[in-house]
Amino acid sequence: MLPSKILLIGRNYADHVQEVFNQSASTLPPTLFMKPPTSIIGPGAAIKIPDFAQKVEFEGEIALVISKPCKNVKKENWRDVVLGLTIVNDVSDRNLQFAEGQWTRGKGIDLSLIHI
């Protein structure tokens, strides 16, 4: 079963912000972006880099898995909706990612979010 959407937070790690953006994390706040369900592949599956990709990079991430549709969950009720944590490998084409104001094209390549 694939999720209906995948929400991610970017620029949330100070050293990585400095490395990728050459700016301090205090001057460049975190941002929210999405990956489509078609970006998911399973453990051990081959990453298929598209021919048009020019600057492909990857990042290990911790993913929070939500078990059911939810909205406005009170913090004391988080266990009602959180299934667990997992590790993913977030693959991006940096040229596409930074060519526009938002990151969907560079982060949303099919088969670019690997569940480990």
Regions found by a protein language model. Name each.
Residues 1-60:
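Extended, compositionally biased flexible segments
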Residues 17-18, 43, 73-75, 95-97:
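Short helix/loop capping segments that flank catalytic or ligand/cofactor-binding pockets
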Residues 20-22, 48-56, 70-77, 102-107:
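A generic local secondary-structure boundary/capping motif
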Residues 20-30, 75-86:
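Short Gly/aromatic-enriched secondary-structure transition segments
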Residues 34-35, 77-110:
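Flexible glycine-rich active-site/ligand-binding loops centered on an Asp-His dyad
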Residues 37-38, 67-71, 91-92:
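Short loop segments at secondary-structure junctions
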Residues 61-65, 86:
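Residues embedded in well-ordered beta-strands
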Residues 114-116:
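Conserved small/polar residues in nucleotide/adenosyl-binding loops
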